[in-house]
Every structure is written in C-alpha cells, then in structure tokens.
Amino acid sequence: MNYSPGLVSLILLLLGRTRGDSVTQMEGPVTLSEEAFLTINCTYTATGYPSLFWYVQYPGEGLQLLLKATKADDKGSNKGFEATYRKETTSFHLEKGSVQVSDSAVYFCALS
C-alpha cells in the first residue's frame, strides 16, 4: 500500500458485542492532510456502563489497543490520540490535534 506524502488515509470500521449493545462509527474512509485535526466519531448503545476501547491496525501489522476508558468521564490517551467516555452523549470520539502519515491505519471503536 502506497501513501502519498502529506496525506493520511484512515479507514474506519466498527466492533460491537451481542445482547443489543453496539457501537457506531458513521465515517467511511477518510483522507486528511498532514497536521490536520482528526475526529473519528463513535457512539454506543449499551445497558449499564460498558468499557470502551479504540483499536488500531497499521498496514501489515496486527490489531493493537490504542486506548480505553472504563467509566464515565475517563479520558484515554496514547500517541497523541485522546478519547473521553461521555455517558450523557453515549460517545467516545477519537481525536488527534495533528495527524501524520504514520497515523495511516484502520481504527476500530469497541465496547465490552
């Protein structure tokens, strides 16, 4: 897979679980300029208080945990990415202030 300098390709997928609990990512593939601000939206439907996760899969590599939050208002952060567990809006949006070509990957929102 070739990447043009200055562009970041993000392919967005989703993971969920059974029993009616689910996560939703509305965006499809996204291409951004380097140093652009990134937001990947993730909303969920669940009973109780699930643990929320962002996973990343870089080209040619396996799935890796990027960050997690286990209770409302927890903020996960790693490698410049952040996401805050918002129970009131049932969201766990992934953000990064300045993306790089090295951020090109597939990003998965999940709950447990």
Swiss-Prot record:
Domain Ig-like residues, every copy: 21-112
Protein name, per record: T cell receptor alpha variable 9-2
Cross-referenced InterPro entries: Ig-like_dom (IPR007110), Ig-like_dom_sf (IPR036179), Ig-like_fold (IPR013783), Ig_V-set (IPR013106), TCR_variable_region (IPR051287)
The UniProt record lists the keyword Membrane: yes
Glycosylation sites: N41
Native organism: Homo sapiens
Gene that encodes the chain: TRAV9-2
Compartments, as annotated in UniProt: Cell membrane
Pfam entry (one): V-set
Lineage: Eukaryota, Metazoa, Chordata, Craniata, Vertebrata
Gene3D superfamilies: Immunoglobulins (2.60.40.10)
Signal sequence interval, chain numbering: 1-20
Subunit structure: Alpha-beta TR is a heterodimer composed of an alpha and beta chain; disulfide-linked. The alpha-beta TR is associated with the transmembrane signaling CD3 coreceptor proteins to form the TR-CD3 (TcR or TCR). The assembly of alpha-beta TR heterodimers with CD3 occurs in the endoplasmic reticulum where a single alpha-beta TR heterodimer associates with one CD3D-CD3E heterodimer, one CD3G-CD3E heterodimer and one CD247 homodimer forming a stable octameric structure. CD3D-CD3E and CD3G-CD3E heterodimers preferentially associate with TR alpha and TR beta chains, respectively.
Main localisation: membrane
